Regions:
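OB-fold and OB-like single-stranded nucleic-acid-recognition modules
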Residues: 25-262
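Bacterial N-terminal signal peptides that target proteins for export
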Residues: 2-12
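Bacterial Sec-type N-terminal signal peptides, specifically the leucine/valine-rich hydrophobic h-region
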Residues: 19-22
Length: 262
């Protein structure tokens, strides 16, 4: 995460956002889909440098927001290690974003790449794109976002969990310390320092291996055993509860029923 970036805060329009709604919002990881690759994150610089390759394709991208333009537009940063330019995103999802001046994370966007023409985009999506900034992106690739979700690094969450409690999140990282009963940890790839994020699966559980790269979709909670057992119907006997509670009580925990393998 860039510490000098303008912050973003993602606020869901629909109140009482559940994990079931979250899974529907971000889409499925299996099945036919007109996209570049279901299980691949695409670099924004790769899209701007090779736009013809991506026009008409669905993509999954993750990066910092540089600027918000009105109610629908935003500029997503380019990747630091790859050539290319920032990319325009038109947000057609049911999630709004606003900028503050705090230090906050990337966002994960799912959408389709089109060639930007202000007039045609306004007509096609019934929009009124008033800002002059849009003129800078005429003829360039634009992502029409169908879903948008906060995607902080694991270490950002464990360092400042209060910012993220009870928010839907999509966390990218490597699987670590896989335990029984649907518990594992996730850490930032190639990161040094910082505390790993605890994850608890409920419902059907994905089989995981150490060092797999994944995106985990879920809601951040404080680890309070009684609440987790009640809210997610976790099948843990008393001895397991005692062991887990001793290790993780009051820590932030991401509760998930959706894991995407990259």
């Amino acid at each position: 995460m860039r510490l000098d970036k303008l912050a973003i805060k993602v606020a869901t329009i629909v109140a009482g956002f559940t994990l079931t709604q979250l899974s529907a919002c971000v889409g499925n990881t299996t099945g036919d889909r007109d996209n570049y690759s279901v299980n691949t994150l695409v670099d924004t610089g790769e899209i701007t440098e090779n736009s013809d390759r991506f026009i008409g394709k669905s993509v999954l991208i993750r990066n910092d927001v540089l600027q918000i333009i009105g109610n629908r537009g935003l500029i997503l940063d380019k990747d630091r290690l790859i050539d290319g330019e920032p990319i325009l995103v038109i947000n057609m999802s049911e999630t709004s974003i606003e900028i503050s001046h705090d230090k906050t994370p990337e966002i994960l966007i799912d959408g389709k790449v089109e060639r930007f023409s202000k007039n045609s985009i306004e007509q096609k999506y019934d929009l009124n794109l008033e800002s002059e900034i849009y003129g800078q992106y005429e003829g360039k690739p634009v992502i029409i976002a169908t879903s948008l979700i906060m995607s902080p690094d694991p270490e950002d969450i464990t360092a400042n969990p209060e910012i993220y409690y009870n928010r839907p999140l999509a966390i990218k990282g490597e699987v670590d310390d896989v335990e029984d009963y649907g518990i594992f940890e996730i850490d930032e790839e190639k990161a040094f320092g910082g505390e790993d994020l605890l994850v608890v699966q409920f419902g059907s559980q994905a089989a995981l291996n150490e060092e797999q790269t994944v995106i985990v979709y879920g809601v951040l909670r404080k680890f309070v055993m009684k609440e987790l057992l009640q809210d997610y119907d976790l099948d843990w006997d008393s001895s397991i509860q005692t062991q887990i509670e001793a290790e993780h009580q009051q820590k932030p925990v991401l509760v998930t029923n959706k894991i995407q393998f990259l």
